[in-house]
C-alpha cells in the first residue's frame, strides 16, 4: 500500500517539478533575451548601394620615370562617378557580448577619353598619349570583423570593432582598336578598428552607426589608410524581417612599391543604401 501511495503521489510531483523547471527555464531565457536590445543571433542583409559620388586618383609610370602622372579617373579618363550595386552584410552573435560581422560589395566603373597629357602616359610599357584610352576599374571589398559589446542595455548597444578589410583593385586599359591592352592589380589586406552604436527607438524602429579607420606602413613597400562611416535606420515589419535605408562612405589610400607594381591609388565612395534584413 505504501509503495502504491508513493508511486501515486510521486509521479504527479515529479511531473510537476519537471514542467515547472522547463517553464522557468523558458521564462528565464525569454527574460534574458528581453533585457538587451538586438538579441537576434544571426542577421543577413541584402541591399543596394547607390554610389552617388566616386573619386579615384591613381599614378601610372611615365617616360620621365618615378611614379608618373597622377590621373583623376572621372576628369582625365571619363570614368563613371555613379553606380548602383548589390551589397551583402551579415553577422553571427555568439552571445550578448561577442559577434562577428561580414560585408562585401564590388564597384565596376568604366571610362573612355582622348588623352592630351604631358608627360606622355605609359602603362605597362605601352604609350597611350594622344590617343583614345578605354578603361575599367573594379573595386572589390571583403570585410570580416569582430565586435565586442562593452555596453548592452535594453535600448543601446555600444561595441568596439577590429577586423580586416581585403581591398582588391583591378585596372584595365586599352585603345580603340584593342591592339594596346594593359592590366594592373592591387590586393591589400588593411586592418581596421572602430566603434559601433545601435539605438532602439522603439521595439521595431532602430538606428545604427559605425565609424572605422586605420593606417598601416610596411617597410617601404606598402602604405595605406582606410576610413569607413555608415549611418542607417531600419524598421521591423515582422519579427524576422526589417527594411531600412542609410548613408555610407568608404575611402582608402594605397601606395605600393614592389617588383610587380609601383604606384598609388586614392579612392572614395559615398552614397546611400536601401536594404531588407532577415533576423534569426
Spans of model-derived segments:
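Cleavable N-terminal export/targeting peptides
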Residues: 1-40
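Short glycine/proline- and aromatic-enriched beta-strand/turn motifs that initiate or cap beta-hairpins
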Residues: 29-107, 271-273, 277-279
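Residues on the lipid-exposed face of transmembrane beta-strands in outer-membrane beta-barrel proteins
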Residues: 46-48, 88-92, 144-148, 162-164, ...
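Outer-membrane beta-barrel pore domains and translocons
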Residues: 47-51, 105-107, 149, 163-167, ...
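Extracellular/periplasm-exposed beta-strand and loop segments of Gram-negative cell-envelope proteins
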Residues: 54-83, 106-140, 166-187, 216-222, ...
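Repeated loop/turn-to-beta-strand initiation elements of outer-membrane beta-barrel proteins
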Residues: 97-100, 154-156, 203-207, 239-243
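Transmembrane beta-strand segments that form the barrel wall of outer-membrane beta-barrel proteins
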Residues: 206-219
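Charged helix-capping and loop-helix junction motifs
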Residues: 225-229
Amino acid at each position: 500500500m505504501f509503495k502504491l501511495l508513493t508511486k501515486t503521489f510521486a509521479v504527479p510531483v515529479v511531473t510537476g517539478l519537471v514542467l515547472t523547471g522547463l517553464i522557468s527555464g523558458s521564462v528565464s531565457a525569454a527574460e534574458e533575451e528581453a533585457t538587451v536590445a538586438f538579441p537576434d543571433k544571426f542577421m543577413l542583409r541584402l541591399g543596394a548601394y547607390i554610389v552617388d559620388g566616386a573619386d579615384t586618383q591613381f599614378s601610372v609610370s611615365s617616360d620621365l620615370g618615378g611614379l608618373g602622372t597622377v590621373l583623376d579617373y572621372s576628369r582625365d579618363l571619363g570614368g563613371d562617378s555613379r553606380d548602383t550595386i548589390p551589397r551583402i552584410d551579415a553577422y553571427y552573435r555568439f552571445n550578448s557580448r561577442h559577434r562577428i560581422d561580414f560585408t562585401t560589395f564590388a564597384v565596376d566603373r568604366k571610362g573612355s577619353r582622348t588623352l592630351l597629357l604631358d608627360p606622355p602616359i605609359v602603362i605597362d610599357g605601352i604609350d597611350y598619349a594622344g590617343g583614345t584610352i578605354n578603361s575599367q576599374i573594379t573595386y572589390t571589398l571583403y570585410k570580416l570583423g569582430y565586435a565586442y559589446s562593452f555596453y548592452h542595455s535594453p535600448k543601446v548597444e555600444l561595441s568596439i570593432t577590429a577586423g580586416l578589410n581585403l581591398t582588391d583593385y583591378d585596372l584595365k586599359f586599352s585603345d580603340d582598336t584593342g591592339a594596346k591592352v594593359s592590366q594592373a592589380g592591387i590586393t591589400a589586406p588593411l586592418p581596421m578598428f572602430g566603434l559601433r552604436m545601435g539605438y532602439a527607438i522603439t521595439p521595431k524602429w532602430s538606428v545604427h552607426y559605425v565609424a572605422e579607420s586605420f593606417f598601416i606602413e610596411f617597410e617601404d613597400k606598402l602604405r595605406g589608410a582606410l576610413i569607413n562611416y555608415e549611418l542607417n535606420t531600419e524598421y521591423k515589419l515582422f519579427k524576422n524581417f526589417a527594411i531600412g535605408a542609410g548613408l555610407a562612405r568608404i575611402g582608402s589610400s594605397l601606395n605600393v612599391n614592389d617588383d610587380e607594381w609601383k604606384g598609388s591609388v586614392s579612392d572614395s565612395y559615398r552614397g546611400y543604401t536601401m536594404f531588407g534584413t532577415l533576423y534569426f
